[in-house]
Amino acid sequence: MTQKNTLLLIDGYGFVFRAYYAQQPLTSPKGEPVGALYGFASMLLKLLSDFKPKHVAVVFDSGGKNFRHHIYPEYKANRPPPPEDLVVQLPLVRDVASNLNFPILEKNGYEADDIIATFAAKTAALGEDVVVISSDKDLLQLMGENIKIYDPLKGKYITEDDVVKKFGTTSDKLREVMALIGDRSDNIPGVPSIGPKTASSLITQFGSVENIFNSLEQVSSLKQRETLQNSKEAALISWQLIGLDSNVDLDFQLNNLEWSPPNSDKLTGFLQEYGFKSLYKRAENLFDIKINDHKEIVENKVTEAKEISNASELADFAKKAEKIGIFGIYLLQHKGDNVALILSLQNQSYIIKISNTSHDLFSYNTKNNNDWFSDIIFNLLTDKSIRKITYSLKPLLKFYAEQSHEITAIEDLELMQYALSAGLSQKNLFEEALKEDNRHLSKPAYREEFKGDTEALATAAYKSVREDASTGSTSKLPLETKFGKMSNVINESARIVAEFTSLYKQNILELKDNKAFRLYSNIDLPICFILDKMEKIGIKVDANYLNQLSAEFGAEILKLEEEIFALSGTKFNIGSPKQLGEILFEKMQLPFGKASAKASSYSTGAEILEKLSEHGYNIADLLLRWRQLTKLKNTYTDSLPKQIDNITHRVHTTFLQTSTTTGRLSSQEPNLQNVPIRSSEGNKIRQAFIAEEGYKLISADYSQIELRILSHIANIDALKQAFINKDDIHTQTACQIFNLQKHELTSEHRRKAKAINFGIIYGISAFGLAKQLNVSNGEASEYIKKYFAEYKGVQEYMEQTKAFASSNGYVINFFGRKCFVPLIHDKKLKQFAERAAINAPIQGTNADIIKIAMINLDQEIEKNNLKTRLVLQIHDELLFEVPEDEVELVTPIIKKIMENSTNMDVPIITEIRVGNNWMEIH
């Protein structure tokens, strides 16, 4: 597609609008919307890569009125204003073009189309080629011998055949046809009832719009003739509006549009300012320049990585590290497999390839095939006088399983980034390295490398790599093959690790400038060690009980299926929404059948089934029960026994520290924070989580913690007083909402009040509350009004928080943690983002309170040399496994520490329960 002597004319705003609607919402490091800017920059880079033009220009509308508005004041009057989050980006689009060194063309009073037409015509007159980059149909009028139109959406040049197929005429007659058709998007009237087929037929017969009106008597259809006669003025105006002005008074100097690579420093600053890290590699390759990942990395040039392959070489590294006092270290893993240990000193990186590839949690130790390096590295990691800089600390802690608690003076760049900008789209520092490797593992290249081997080996190896492309797993490959295939990702990772020290210095400065250093050093970093310990300990699960429960669920599922088939009169795949919809709404002719927006199949979600149930259709109850049991069976009773470790005979979850916007922890593989609690079946599953013999489980659960936090941060006197007086807050709310005395309340009143109390925290709407309480929208709205009247200050807090989030792009919790709300300017998702903003300071404060409690409890347990161990964190709750002879000792310690983790205007209350399994303590 190379066009070395071609002028490329780019429809600027056409690109920007396409980019906005094609791109997921993105925000800059400052929380500003930049999705359209990112998409625009990405498109421009692609054009440079594809076309390699000698001359190029991005052409913009100047805005405001132009000559077409004088002809027809209603021109484009029907267009709605662009979305708010796009409006704030529009003034910056020229910066995108100029930072990529694109010449810009625009002129007051003219649209981009006219400027494109002018430059295209003048360039073509010189015998030079022109390519217009646009999806705008109006520009198809320009097509000619030296002028081509390239549609970036379709990724192809538009041909005359394409124009004829769509409009029924050639490009030179397009203006005539479109004048008759009109253009709704631009509010160009055209002639009523005349579409492309009729218009092209008339132009074929008469040659032009003018000729039609000069020969109206020759129009055979009386109806068409009358329509044309009545619309003559509109048609002639449309002809003027659609035509392009190719004589705009502009200084035409083709040499002024010659493109050259952008200034490296200028481009680096631009990409960093807007957070466009994913464009770094493309820009580097395209412009043959170096873009530093952070502004401060200019101290030393990163040199090619060196491999350390024996203890003597590593000992030399250790001596240098001791002398310098700081080094980088990163354990490169792909899907749990250890691939390489990467070290760095003063921007020089070193690679140690790891032969032990097992991803069994308990295979990591210092007595394996990696003996020659593990002890030397461990001595460095435990040396208090040497600072270690890593990224994603936990894999390194697991590598030194039993001794990980001895590791000291280590910093985690990932946790630093999170403390600075929780909620923003965080990209793994090594993401580009993984992308490079995934490109390297493309199918043709892979097969070529295995040329000469059996087809079976190539196929198996290719399959194993591609199935896990996002993580680059190579666990099924021979070692020599693994290191060969991983060479790209190892080398690219080494380049990044070489910059760890510089990154650390920059992050420390930013943390201190943003008052986030205490969050990182006092909460985020120490909790990482505790989570690692919890993951290694795991929790005991009764596999035999789960197997029995699975069989019990399975038997009921089979019975439900028989009843469903009997009621429907046929067998079908109940798990297929498409088949289920056809059975319910076509075969059985049940009401409420509604096709989903994105597919031709019927909606069969819980809302529809519950509605059918309310109207007495028994099959809906059976289906809801079937779904409940199959989900529990698949998610828990079938899968949990398979996740029990063969060595520890316990289940080991993984806690994620940086996956939420609020600082809240999450759990995966398996997710043990989501085990159901509100149903009898959910409680049966909790019964499977048991204490070891001679131990008890202790649950320590914060009581109504989020309401207590709300009362403090929003300064709600009525709420604070209720908590200080130890009143039942749900009972108090019920009395106010329903105008009843305490003795008149029922459990249903309290249940509704509880839903209102907690719903308000999440910014629930009247519609949402009505649905939850099964009341009318009017009733729900009245409940909310009464709530705001009783608890004065809550509504003000909500409005102030939304306004702060809108102005700053983030909210702040009690401890000063910034919780970014990147969608706050997204028109479609604004309400969702506002609800998130209201809740984030509360949920984020809760998350930090319980993390502080975990840290303090861990210290107390260590200090007293107790065998008590923390095994799970479930948001408001901590689960301990405690020796029976420590229960009486440790229970008051847990309660005291949890209730004194922070100072607020209201007491923090912890409820303690002791039992043999998780069900007993709930």
UniProtKB/Swiss-Prot annotation:
Give yes or no: UniProt keyword Isomerase.
Answer: no
**Ranges that cross the membrane:** none
CDD domains membership: DNA_pol_A_pol_I_C, H3TH_53EXO, PIN_53EXO
Offer one example of a GO biological process linked to this entry.
DNA-templated DNA replication
- Keyword field: DNA damage, DNA repair, DNA replication, DNA-binding, DNA-directed DNA polymerase, Exonuclease, Hydrolase, Nuclease, Nucleotidyltransferase, Transferase
Pfam families per UniProt: 5_3_exonuc, 5_3_exonuc_N, DNA_pol_A
| Molecular function GO labels | 5'-3' exonuclease activity; DNA binding; DNA-directed DNA polymerase activity
Query: Does Lyase show up as a keyword for this record?
Result: no
Residue span, RPE1 insert domain: 439-487
Enumerate the catalysed reactions: DNA(n) + a 2'-deoxyribonucleoside 5'-triphosphate = DNA(n+1) + diphosphate
Superkingdom of origin organism? Bacteria
Could you say which protein family the record assigns here?
A: Belongs to the DNA polymerase type-A family.
The record's note on quaternary structure and interaction partners says: Single-chain monomer with multiple functions.
Protein task: In addition to polymerase activity, this DNA polymerase exhibits 5'-3' exonuclease activity.
Its protein name is DNA polymerase I
Organism encoding this protein: Rickettsia felis (strain ATCC VR-1525 / URRWXCal2) (Rickettsia azadi)
Q: Which gene encodes it?
A: polA
